[in-house]
């Protein structure tokens, strides 16, 4: 069929999305930064179920590594048809007055620059004017982009606000090139990311404030991502789906 690249595909939302895309017939490129074992586990689950997958190591904040990752995809016979920009980082909960430039820049380099670089390389390959066959991109933002994450991680929230704007701008740039660009904004999902923020049980702490009174599962986000990438969403671009239980 075609290749779908999932950045940060070894855990959480990325993992769930990779598994679901394989079920839809994509050959899945599972990107990871550090945990080769986890990425290989995803690949093995896919191949054992009769699907196709391969793993690619890259730190998306590093331009050379991003270019190398897409060059590796070019070596495969199938074209790149889908990009899920999912890799992201989050640091320990902290107020703005205690943030350092180093922390802010690390968050932005992965969560913003990394997304831009992956979009750039995907567009080069998908655009009709470049001989591509079109494609679809889904950026994984966060409901934090409009809630702001006060007292927790405004830096992370701001990085996701940038992704919302990237989605809008890029969708308009490439709509005539056969490329659709959409965005999901998860919130309060049971993933390992909350441990990175220093509070593994955060979802359970805040779920009473969520209108639906529960946290979400990575698979619920994956369903929305896969729909946006599919032909069922063929007239959808520049759109946002919030998956945050009503928040």
UniProtKB/Swiss-Prot annotation:
It holds the Pfam family adh_short_C2. Substrate binds at residue 142. Keywords: Oxidoreductase. The active site is at 156 (proton acceptor). Gene3D superfamilies: NAD(P)-binding Rossmann-like Domain (3.40.50.720). CDD domains: SDR_c (cd05233). It is an enzyme of class 1 (oxidoreductase). NADP(+) binds at residues 4-28. Signal peptide: none annotated. The keyword Oxidoreductase applies. GO terms for molecular function: oxidoreductase activity, acting on CH-OH group of donors. PANTHER family: NADPH-DEPENDENT ALDEHYDE REDUCTASE-LIKE PROTEIN, CHLOROPLASTIC-RELATED (PTHR48107), RE15974P (PTHR48107:SF7). This is Uncharacterized oxidoreductase YgfF. The lineage of its organism: Bacteria, Pseudomonadati, Pseudomonadota, Gammaproteobacteria, Enterobacterales. The gene is ygfF.
């Amino acid at each position: 069929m075609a290749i779908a690249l999932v950045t940060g595909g070894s855990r959480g939302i990325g993992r769930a999305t990779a598994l679901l895309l394989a079920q839809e017939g994509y050959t899945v490129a599972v990107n990871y930064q550090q945990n080769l074992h986890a990425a290989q586990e995803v690949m093995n689950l896919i191949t054992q179920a009769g699907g196709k997958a391969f793993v690619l190591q890259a730190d998306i904040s590093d331009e050379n590594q991003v270019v190398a990752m897409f060059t590796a995809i070019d070596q495969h016979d199938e074209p790149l048809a889908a990009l899920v920009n999912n890799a992201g980082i989050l640091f320990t909960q902290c107020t703005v007055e205690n943030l350092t430039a180093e922390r802010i820049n690390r968050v932005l380099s992965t969560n913003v620059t990394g997304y831009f670089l992956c979009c750039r390389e995907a567009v080069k390959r998908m655009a009709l004017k470049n001989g591509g066959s079109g494609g679809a991109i889904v950026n994984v933002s966060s409901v934090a982009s409009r809630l702001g994450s006060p007292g927790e991680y405004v830096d992370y929230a701001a990085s996701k606000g940038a992704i919302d704007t990237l989605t809008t701008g890029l969708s308009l740039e490439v709509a005539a090139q056969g490329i659709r660009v959409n965005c999901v904004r998860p919130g309060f999902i049971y993933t390992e990311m909350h441990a990175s923020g220093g509070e593994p049980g955060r979802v359970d702490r805040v779920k009473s404030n969520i209108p639906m009174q529960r946290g979400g599962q990575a698979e619920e986000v994956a369903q929305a991502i896969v729909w946006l990438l599919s032909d069922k969403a063929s007239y959808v671009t520049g759109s946002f789906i919030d998956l945050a239980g009503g928040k």
